[in-house]
């Protein structure tokens, strides 16, 4: 039996309609819940969290630790599909004593989706690109990840080129011996450095694949 939960009444009501339409009312129980709050310890051996950002995914897991803190090594499962900040989710799993068993990357209508399967266990600390893009996907030379990296590289180069090209002119226009002008230039320089570092990480990862 499955338990489906949502913090909002509207989506939960629509989910209930869908469950009834497909004749699964006896197999899926719906609960109004903020994260995992309404799920009891030992009630589920697999927890699926999908359709939200990585920060919120981590918050739900942290606040719902009563569900998983006593799980056995290699037995119960987390299935996570964060829409952003995947690196934070991977760091969280490592810090909380989980091991990533495998990952999958999918694409639909130009959007990319990550699915992470994890269980209790020890995860060896990884490199920055392992947390950013997924060690399992890099190791498998996943073709969807490669396409994603190519897209990210192209977009990052374009943004970086625009910022760098206009940097001298922007400095001239913005810096008027004022604190506000210096702050704007400092922020732009930090953004350029951030993009350059990200581009280098993409290139390094692509070379591995």
Predicted regions, residues:
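Conserved S-adenosyl-L-methionine
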Residues: 1
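S-adenosyl-L-methionine
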Residues: 5-45
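Class I S-adenosyl-L-methionine
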Residues: 37-43, 55-209
């Amino acid at each position: 039996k499955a338990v489906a939960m949502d913090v909002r009444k509207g989506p939960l009501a629509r989910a209930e309609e869908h469950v009834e339409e497909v004749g699964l009312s006896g197999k899926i129980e719906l609960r109004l819940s903020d994260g995992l709050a309404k799920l009891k310890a030992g009630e589920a051996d697999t927890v699926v969290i999908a359709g939200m950002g990585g920060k919120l995914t981590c918050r739900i897991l942290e606040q719902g630790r009563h569900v998983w803190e006593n799980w056995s090594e290699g037995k119960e499962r987390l299935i996570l599909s964060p829409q952003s900040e995947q690196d934070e989710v991977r760091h969280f799993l490592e810090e909380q004593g989980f091991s990533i068993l495998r990952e999958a990357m999918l694409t639909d209508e130009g959007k990319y989706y990550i699915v992470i399967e994890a269980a209790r266990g020890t995860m060896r600390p990884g490199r920055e690109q392992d947390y950013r893009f997924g060690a399992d996907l890099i190791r498998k030379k996943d073709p969807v990840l490669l396409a994603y990296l190519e897209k990210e590289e192209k977009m990052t180069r374009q943004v970086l080129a625009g910022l760098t090209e206009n940097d001298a002119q922007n400095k001239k226009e913005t810096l008027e011996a004022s604190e506000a002008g210096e702050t704007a230039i400092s922020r732009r320089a930090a953004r350029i450095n951030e993009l350059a570092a990200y581009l280098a990480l993409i290139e390094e990862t692509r070379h591995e694949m």
